[in-house]
């Protein structure tokens, strides 16, 4: 079956473009030039780029530079793109040369052809609405692409933040549920001193809360845009009316508190804002992976590992070992973290590679940053739903571990000194006897004294909790 085509020309030459396509010659060239990932532009990025084109059409019309009929047609075409109706027309690869020019022209061509069609012109004629003269009026790739990237980051961060709020709540529930479960804390994988399992999970709550707040602060990096600066920040070919109104008009469309950069040269040259956002996303991923390492260790076994907690069984763990269940959810979260660390390195190197008045590597920055945010959001969701909510504690086993450990000898130090306590601990390890047994055998303390010194709850209480507990004891 032969596809009908139309001829389109650009400064490079003439090409045949599918007759029914809304994209044009420049998008088609880009598709042929950049068969890199097979991944197209992120749909949220496409939507935001269309928002910018819509704001530009409104602003240029208000400035008297774009006739009403053309502006209305462009706005209608933009609304269709925003609604996702022309998604298949965006054919360029996510990673492309040219600082995003291919993505910008793909959008310009689609909107021009659809707007022209609304006004009664055939696709490819560009007589009524031209991709450069009308759709791209007062704009440059060098400011619409980074602005679309910032809006997309803001849109993608919102569901990640919601996922983190949910994770924080689920961890808080476990912190409360396990508050009375005493186990042995470990430093450098060696027995240390007793700790409540609830305190362990409360530490995770604080960590996730801190990560969430960092991400909230990262929004500020994305609110400053360089629209109006055109190619290098000098605002060439931009009217005063457009220069001062484009950002407020875009702000109305998006609902974000956007502001035009005070230094448009800086905002056009540098990508440090994206590096900063990537950094906080990476930090969150690293923190969650560390927590997942803990969960895997604490649930290891069930007979020959730590065995302090049970993770919900989600699937068979082996094709050869019957009944084996693996900690698959913590494992996948850690893998996402590794992936994000790699993305962050790419983003860092791409930002560093900019030269003079522009960084040409925004496409790879966006491709990696968008994926980092979306994969982390999904990882956080599955961690909450498929792991944290179903964790249970092996209470008796935790207590046995604590009581059999020589680590509780630390509590003796204020009463019998470090040296004597160390001797008790070494003897306990060597003989297999408990610290409690040895202290009583050697007559170092009475059973009543020892009961108070080795009280696991007193050993794990902090600050005001300890004062309240001591007050209750005296009252009794």
State where each predicted segment sits.
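Conserved, well-structured ligand/cofactor-binding cores
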Residues: 1-476
